[in-house]
């Protein structure tokens, strides 16, 4: 649906070249809710602006719904843009226009009939839960209601793609949750592909099925949300995951336990999925290795509606200790594991 092929973007400011994007490649599949996460300055917003051609790539290709738009003119982009909706952090509503007129604006600009405009706007306001606010003005609405108006406006033209640039950053946690639920409903009801730009890993965890992690203009990690949360490969991905889920004990706790430890030991970090959480894993391990298994840390969370568990286990070692059987057990049970000592 959206594909970036070795995309780079360079800005020239005061005779200085700034590389906003460097050799970015990934694909957003049809019906994805695809998250792009990174800190400020990572290049996220520049990336999303390439999709609707608000910016043009310096190098590489940007493919949107089968069209290579890299070198499209504004005229050539008109039909493509009809299939792309966008919402922003600060809503971008017309304060002098009613809710109804704000939502209707794309249809008015497209010179649709009054009958069609009324029908379509009414449908969208009902979908976002603001039918009773149609005659009010933006200043009379809460932040969450303003974003719902913006979503209705983005959907009113029946787009195939919805771009969300930090759409929940200005909202409180409860309102953020309600907006994410609405966006998930947009995806499921209309089959709209959503590309989420955010710096909040909780947004990725709650709504996205796939994610790209950006740092300094580069995509440093991609994968399903479950893959990235279960085994983040890069330091930045690990840092983002740790903001919403504690996946291992604190360094101070490990240091204290190591100081108290008598004899040699081996530690394992394991990731247990929902289908495995009811299995007698610890009991099985005790029987396999013939010794006690210490649980140094355990935490449970929900990712994409599935319960997952992170555990840090410790085995005391002696001459009879054999880890081959333990490793084989984890592999047979499809339990992701990592030896950490």
Curated annotation (Swiss-Prot):
<comment type="similarity">
    <text>Belongs to the ABC transporter superfamily. Methionine importer (TC 3.A.1.24) family.</text>
</comment>
<dbReference type="InterPro" id="IPR018449">
    <property type="entry name" value="NIL_domain"/>
</dbReference>
<protein>
    <recommendedName>
        <fullName>Methionine import ATP-binding protein MetN 1</fullName>
        <ecNumber>7.4.2.11</ecNumber>
    </recommendedName>
</protein>
<dbReference type="GO" id="GO:0033232">
    <property type="term" value="F:ABC-type D-methionine transporter activity"/>
</dbReference>
<dbReference type="Pfam" id="PF00005">
    <property type="entry name" value="ABC_tran"/>
</dbReference>
<keyword id="KW-1278">Translocase</keyword>
<dbReference type="InterPro" id="IPR050086">
    <property type="entry name" value="MetN_ABC_transporter-like"/>
</dbReference>
<dbReference type="GO" id="GO:0005524">
    <property type="term" value="F:ATP binding"/>
</dbReference>
<keyword id="KW-0067">ATP-binding</keyword>
<comment type="function">
    <text>Part of the ABC transporter complex MetNIQ involved in methionine import. Responsible for energy coupling to the transport system.</text>
</comment>
<dbReference type="InterPro" id="IPR003439">
    <property type="entry name" value="ABC_transporter-like_ATP-bd"/>
</dbReference>
<dbReference type="InterPro" id="IPR017871">
    <property type="entry name" value="ABC_transporter-like_CS"/>
</dbReference>
<comment type="subunit">
    <text>The complex is composed of two ATP-binding proteins (MetN), two transmembrane proteins (MetI) and a solute-binding protein (MetQ).</text>
</comment>
<dbReference type="GO" id="GO:0016887">
    <property type="term" value="F:ATP hydrolysis activity"/>
</dbReference>
<keyword id="KW-0813">Transport</keyword>
<keyword id="KW-0472">Membrane</keyword>
<keyword id="KW-0547">Nucleotide-binding</keyword>
<dbReference type="InterPro" id="IPR041701">
    <property type="entry name" value="MetN_ABC"/>
</dbReference>
<dbReference type="InterPro" id="IPR027417">
    <property type="entry name" value="P-loop_NTPase"/>
</dbReference>
<feature type="binding site">
    <location>
        <begin position="38"/>
        <end position="45"/>
    </location>
    <ligand>
        <name>ATP</name>
    </ligand>
</feature>
<dbReference type="InterPro" id="IPR045865">
    <property type="entry name" value="ACT-like_dom_sf"/>
</dbReference>
<dbReference type="Pfam" id="PF09383">
    <property type="entry name" value="NIL"/>
</dbReference>
<keyword id="KW-0029">Amino-acid transport</keyword>
<dbReference type="InterPro" id="IPR003593">
    <property type="entry name" value="AAA+_ATPase"/>
</dbReference>
<dbReference type="GO" id="GO:0005886">
    <property type="term" value="C:plasma membrane"/>
</dbReference>
<keyword id="KW-1003">Cell membrane</keyword>
<feature type="domain" description="ABC transporter">
    <location>
        <begin position="2"/>
        <end position="241"/>
    </location>
</feature>
């Amino acid at each position: 649906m959206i594909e970036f092929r070795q995309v780079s973007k360079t800005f020239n400011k005061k005779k200085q070249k700034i590389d906003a994007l460097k050799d970015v490649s990934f694909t957003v599949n049809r019906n994805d809710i695809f998250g792009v996460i990174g800190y400020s300055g990572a290049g996220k917003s520049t990336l999303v602006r390439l999709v609707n051609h608000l910016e043009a790539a310096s190098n590489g290709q940007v493919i949107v719904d089968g069209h290579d738009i890299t070198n499209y003119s504004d005229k050539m982009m008109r039909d493509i843009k009809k299939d792309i909706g966008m919402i922003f952090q600060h809503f971008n509503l017309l304060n002098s226009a009613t809710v109804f007129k704000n939502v209707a604006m794309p249809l008015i600009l497209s010179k649709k009939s009054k009958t069609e405009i009324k029908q379509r706007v009414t449908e969208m306001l009902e979908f976002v839960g603001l039918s009773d606010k149609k005659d009010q003005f933006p200043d009379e609405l809460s932040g969450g209601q303003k974003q719902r108006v913006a979503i209705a406006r983005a959907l009113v033209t029946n787009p195939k793609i919805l771009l969300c640039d930090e759409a929940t950053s200005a909202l409180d946690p409860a309102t953020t949750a309600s907006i994410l639920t609405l966006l998930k409903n947009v995806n499921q009801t209309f089959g709209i592909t959503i590309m989420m730009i955010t710096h909040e890993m909780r947004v990725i965890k709650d709504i996205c099925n796939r994610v790209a992690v950006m740092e300094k203009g580069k995509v440093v990690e991609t994968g399903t949300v479950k893959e990235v949360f279960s085994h983040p490969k890069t330091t930045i991905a690990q840092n983002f995951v740790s903001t919403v889920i504690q996946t291992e004990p604190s360094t101070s706790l490990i240091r204290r336990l190591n100081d108290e430890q008598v004899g040699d030991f081996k530690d394992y970090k394991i990731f247990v999925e929902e289908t495995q959480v009811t299995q007698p894993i610890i009991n099985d391990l005790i029987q396999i290795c013939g010794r006690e298994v210490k649980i140094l840390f355990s935490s449970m969370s929900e990712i994409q509606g599935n319960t997952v568990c992170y555990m840090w286990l410790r085995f005391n070692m002696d001459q009879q200790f054999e880890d081959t059987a333990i490793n084989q057990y984890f592999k047979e049970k499809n339990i992701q594991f990592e030896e950490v000592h």
